[in-house]
């Protein structure tokens, strides 16, 4: 691993690292916030997944999460949103290719060689964080938009791995909305049954009651993508039918930007702390 930058922040350390990923077959960067040490107990981790066009730095520089994370004693880990590099398949659109990995394992050429973000987030990155930093094995996950989709599918596909999950303006039924249809048809092929494995609503309907974990979703009602791309009410109905402990908050006037995230990130960190710090 190579340390790219480091900054003292609220008596903790904000760092950016590069490492060679065997899962993605390319170098990857991630950002991490290490809160000031409190005692000899390793702190828990919150993984944050960002949205389309983003990298590991958007949340770090725009969300203002470090102050509360330092207070609570929670490590923040921000991976990139896709594999990167000249040898990595790409597309001219903002919603496919680099910066738009959708947190799945691609099965179709040319994407399958590198686009295995699900395996990277499930296995390689947590193992790296565990081995290189003083952290506990308790973790939660959160994200925004495409990253909210990622957080939800990571939690739904891995019962017992996370204490809680939250999301801001998540894509919840990618099989049925333009962003998801475009990405899934390219990454996964035309078999729509294969798409269901990466769709939060489908995964929610297939879930077992004993696997449910506390879930918080915030959605601005002035979000330009709300009607066509996000549709959180569809997931809320699935959660209702499955008696899944999910809170959906519609926030009046808020849009899809990081100003929205910055306004409510403290709520999300305190929500996760209830379960991470048990």
UniProtKB/Swiss-Prot annotation:
Catalysis performed (reactions): S-formylglutathione + H2O = formate + glutathione + H(+)
GO biological process: formaldehyde catabolic process
Enzyme Commission number(s) of this protein: 3.1.2.12
Top-level taxon: Bacteria
Active site (record annotation): 145 (charge relay system), 223 (charge relay system), 256 (charge relay system)
Keyword Iron in record: no
Keywords annotated in UniProt: Hydrolase, Serine esterase
A Pfam family of this chain: Esterase
GO terms, molecular function: carboxylic ester hydrolase activity; S-formylglutathione hydrolase activity
Gene Ontology CC terms: cytosol
Protein function: Serine hydrolase involved in the detoxification of formaldehyde. Hydrolyzes S-formylglutathione to glutathione and formate.
Family: Belongs to the esterase D family.
Protein name: S-formylglutathione hydrolase YeiG
Annotated organism of origin: Escherichia coli (strain SMS-3-5 / SECEC)
Gene this chain is encoded by: yeiG
């Amino acid at each position: 691993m190579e340390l790219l930058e480091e900054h003292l922040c609220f008596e903790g350390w904000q760092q950016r690292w590069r490492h060679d990923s065997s899962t993605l077959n390319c170098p990857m960067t991630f950002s991490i916030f290490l809160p000031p040490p409190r005692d000899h107990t390793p702190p828990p981790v919150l993984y944050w997944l960002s949205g389309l066009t983003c990298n590991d730095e958007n949340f770090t520089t725009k969300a203002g999460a470090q102050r509360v994370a330092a207070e609570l004693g929670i490590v923040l880990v921000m991976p990139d949103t896709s594999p990167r590099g000249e040898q990595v398949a790409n597309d001219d659109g903002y919603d496919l290719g680099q910066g738009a990995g959708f947190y799945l394992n691609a099965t179709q050429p040319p994407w399958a060689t590198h686009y295995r973000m699900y395996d990277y987030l499930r296995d390689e990155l947590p193992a790296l964080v565990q081995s290189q930093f003083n952290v506990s094995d308790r973790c939660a996950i959160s994200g925004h938009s495409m990253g909210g989709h990622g957080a939800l599918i990571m939690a739904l596909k891995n019962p017992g791995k996370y204490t809680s999950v939250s999301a801001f303006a998540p894509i919840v039924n990618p099989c049925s909305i333009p962003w998801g249809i475009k990405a899934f048809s390219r990454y996964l092929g035309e078999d729509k049954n294969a798409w269901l494995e990466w769709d939060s609503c489908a995964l929610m309907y297939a879930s077992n009651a004993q696997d449910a974990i506390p879930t918080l979703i915030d959605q601005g009602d002035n979000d330009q993508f709300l009607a066509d791309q996000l549709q959180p009410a569809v997931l809320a109905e699935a959660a209702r039918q499955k008696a899944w402990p999910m809170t959906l908050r519609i926030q009046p006037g808020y849009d899809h930007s990081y100003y929205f995230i910055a306004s409510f990130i403290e709520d999300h960190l305190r929500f996760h702390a209830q379960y991470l710090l048990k």
